């Protein structure tokens, strides 16, 4: 851990919470987001959060840009199980360490006297036959009391832990602490006065019998002196922890403003909504770079790879959208009788008349046929033939030669004086028809010639205008190519920088997508038929990149936070757990630097974190001083039992010696040379007993192996001293 930074002066008046309007808050946030780093550098302060990049850190952790298998390890990192186990360990350890030796000793003596299991009574009851039997009974008696005492104290301590859990202190969440470390390596906090924020959860908890049963406490307190000391210390610890955690608030990620002064190496933080100012706990110090900072955090290291993989997946999605859109070309094969001018004439006949005879005699039909014939011309000379055919067909309808007066000027002088005959009339009719045909053809040719000349002039003008437009188009195309190239270079630069915020979204790309128009009309003939054509589907593969990103997530989380992977015999992952190094790296700064809680007892180990609550309680009990006190009392009690048995045998042997001396004959007075014991064994035993009795009388005035300093002239087994 890097330690505390030098921070700006902290004003207590600035801690007052102000609630501005929502519109002003949003405008203020937009202002912060649009702040230029260069402008801030002039004031020696730069905004390092929120920025586009730091906001993306949190969105990536939330799975907005996708989710991989390796990213799931982060859930193991931000699990609160380790912090909960540490709090349980602290309450248990410090509460049980409050036991006093004198209280524990008095509780044991009281229990032994109430059950009639003192050392003297055990010696009299079980020691007359065998010392081993009495010692075994004594050991079982003490183990029974020891286990019941352990169960009682652990249950009371667990009730204290339950009370602390129901306090529901979420302002200093361990998960938010891990999120800040993973994103920025900095933890912004706001501290409050403990006196003003002190809230004791124990009285409230004690008033609810379902959570904190008072009857259990009073019952245990009436029988055991150690309960009072344990519960008193436990309440103090719970109050201390709850007040310490309530006095600290870890700020929310989306409502925090962090500024950095590179020259002073200072950080200052502010809550955008409430206006509160706090301090920053620097776990990993950021590095200055080109008007901004580079964070020493896992998200900073893998951010570029995540964005590139996300862009690749977006590109694949766009390719799937583009390449699955079919280009449909529908072509129909026509009948041979429907091709060309003949087919068009047949259609006209069907439209203008039901029968071919009626259609042929129709003036509209003949006129349409003339238009179709003119449209089907391939040469200029075809005009005369087409018009003549039309006139031949309609000569009886357009021109009535009998009604024409040939004597009028224009028909010649010879026709005026001659009488008309049938032959002459026929010849005149032919001449008139030929003259009419020639006049019509000449008029049409003159009209077409004028129209064509006019078209030629128009075409020449259009060619000149087209030439100018073509020059302008070429210049515009060159300019457009230049703009496209610059835009492509700029977009590629932003993509290389890993900033996907400048790239258009998938919806915009799909909307602005231009499809090439494929014209196949020139290669199609009358023999073509209907067909559907689809473009080939190409989608870039990103499985390898996705797998690499998953492995990168996994390696970064495991190595950065020192996690441990548990596998089975087949090598399959079973679980991801905290190692001892991870606990030291993450848990210790959380309690010491963030919460300012220093008296937490020993740090839990990785094996204790994943134990059940019952196993943890038993494990903690064996590490406290009460366990040592109980071992000492057990040793002393066994020694007292053995001593009481030895004394019992000594007293019994002395009484037997006195009875034998009374049975001796007169005159001997117990002299050694005059009296012989029935056996050598009896003689040796009597000598040892006499030596022990002499030694006991010599040291009777000493306070020898006194188990209770307040006893009035009594031995450890309760008998009155000599």
Curated annotation (Swiss-Prot):
Residues passing through the membrane, by range: none
Subcellular location, record wording: Virion; Host nucleus
Compositionally biased intervals (Basic residues): 684-696
Composition skew (Polar residues), residue ranges: 404-422
Entry keyword set: Disulfide bond, Host nucleus, Viral genome packaging, Viral release from host cell, Virion
InterPro entries according to UniProt: Herpes_Portal
Gene Ontology biological-process entries: chromosome organization
Region (Putative leucine zipper motif): 448-469
Domain of life: Viruses
Principal place of residence: virion
Region (Disordered): 402-426, 658-722
UniProt signal peptide: none
Subunit structure, as described in the record: Homododecamerizes. Interacts with terminase subunits TRM1 and TRM3.
Free-text function comment from the UniProt entry: Forms a portal in the viral capsid through which viral DNA is translocated during DNA packaging. Assembles as a dodecamer at a single fivefold axe of the T=16 icosahedric capsid. Binds to the molecular motor that translocates the viral DNA, termed terminase.
Name of the protein: Portal protein
Lineage summary: Viruses, Duplodnaviria, Heunggongvirae, Peploviricota, Herviviricetes
This protein's encoding gene: MDV018
């Amino acid at each position: 851990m890097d330690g505390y930074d030098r921070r700006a002066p902290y004003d207590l008046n600035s801690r007052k919470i102000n609630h501005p309007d929502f519109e002003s808050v949003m405008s203020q946030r937009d202002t912060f987001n649009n702040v230029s780093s260069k402008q801030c550098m002039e004031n020696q302060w730069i905004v390092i959060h929120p920025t586009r990049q730091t906001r993306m850190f949190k969105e990536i952790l939330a799975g907005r840009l996708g989710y991989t298998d390796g990213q799931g390890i982060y859930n193991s990192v931000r699990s609160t199980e380790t912090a909960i186990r540490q709090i349980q360990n602290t309450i248990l350890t410090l509460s049980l360490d409050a036991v006093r030796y004198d209280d524990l000793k008095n509780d044991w003596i009281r229990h032994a006297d109430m059950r009639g299991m003192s050392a003297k009574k055990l010696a009299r009851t079980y020691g007359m036959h065998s010392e081993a039997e009495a010692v075994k009974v004594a050991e079982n008696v003490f183990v029974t009391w020891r286990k019941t005492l352990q169960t009682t104290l652990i249950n009371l301590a667990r009730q204290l832990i339950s009370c602390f859990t129901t306090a529901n202190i979420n302002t200093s969440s361990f998960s938010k602490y891990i999120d800040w470390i993973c994103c920025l390596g900095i933890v912004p906090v706001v501290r409050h006065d403990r006196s003003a924020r002190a809230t004791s959860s124990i009285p409230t908890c004690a008033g609810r019998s379902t959570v904190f049963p008072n009857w259990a406490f009073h019952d245990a307190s009436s029988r055991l002196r150690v309960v009072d000391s344990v519960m008193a210390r436990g309440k103090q610890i719970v109050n201390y922890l709850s007040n310490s955690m309530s006095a600290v608030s870890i700020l929310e990620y989306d409502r925090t403003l962090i500024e950095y002064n590179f020259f002073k190496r200072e950080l200052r933080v502010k809550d955008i909504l409430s206006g509160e100012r706090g301090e920053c706990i620097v776990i990993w110090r950021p590095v200055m770079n080109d008007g901004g900072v580079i964070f020493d955090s896992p998200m900073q290291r893998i951010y570029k790879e995540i964005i590139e993989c996300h862009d690749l997946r977006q590109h694949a999605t766009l390719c799937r959208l583009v390449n699955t859109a079919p280009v449909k070309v529908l072509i129909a094969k026509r009948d041979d009788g429907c091709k060309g001018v003949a087919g068009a004439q047949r259609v006209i006949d069907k439209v203008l008349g039901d029968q071919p005879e009626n259609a042929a005699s129709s003036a509209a039909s003949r006129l349409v046929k003339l238009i179709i014939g003119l449209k089907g011309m391939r040469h200029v000379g075809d005009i005369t033939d087409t018009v003549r055919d039309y006139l031949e067909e309609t000569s009886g309808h357009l021109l009535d030669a009998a009604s024409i007066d040939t004597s009028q000027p224009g028909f010649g002088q010879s026709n005026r004086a001659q009488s008309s005959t049938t032959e002459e009339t026929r010849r005149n009719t032919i001449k008139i028809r030929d003259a009419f045909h020639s006049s019509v053809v000449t008029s049409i040719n003159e009209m077409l010639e004028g129209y064509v000349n006019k078209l030629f002039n128009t075409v020449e003008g259009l060619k000149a205008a087209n030439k100018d437009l073509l020059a302008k188009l070429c210049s515009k195309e060159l300019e457009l190519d230049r703009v496209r190239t610059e835009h492509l270079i700029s977009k590629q630069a932003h993509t290389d920088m890993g900033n996907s915020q400048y790239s258009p979204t998938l919806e915009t790309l799909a909307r602005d997508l231009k499809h090439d128009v494929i014209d196949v009309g020139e290669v199609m003939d009358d023999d073509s038929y209907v067909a559907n054509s689809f473009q080939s589907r190409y989608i870039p593969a990103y499985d390898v990149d996705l797998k690499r990103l998953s492995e990168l997530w996994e390696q970064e989380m495991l190595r950065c936070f020192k996690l441990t992977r548990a596998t089975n015999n087949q090598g399959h992952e079973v679980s991801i757990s905290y190692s001892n190094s991870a606990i030291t790296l993450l848990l210790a700064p959380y309690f010491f630097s963030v919460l300012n809680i220093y008296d937490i007892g020993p740090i839990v180990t990785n094996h204790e974190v994943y134990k059940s609550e019952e196993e943890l309680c038993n494990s903690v009990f064996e590490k406290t001083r009460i366990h040592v006190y109980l071992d000492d009392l057990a040793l002393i009690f066994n020694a007292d039992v053995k001593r009481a048995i030895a004394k019992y045998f000594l007293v019994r042997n002395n009484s037997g010696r006195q009875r034998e001396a009374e049975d001796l004959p007169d005159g001997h007075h117990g002299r050694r040379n005059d009296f012989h014991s029935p056996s050598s064994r009896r003689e040796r035993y009597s000598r040892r007993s006499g030596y022990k009795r002499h030694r006991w009388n010599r040291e009777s005035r000493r306070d020898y192996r006194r188990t209770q300093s307040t006893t009035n002239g009594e031995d450890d087994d309760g008998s009155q001293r000599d």
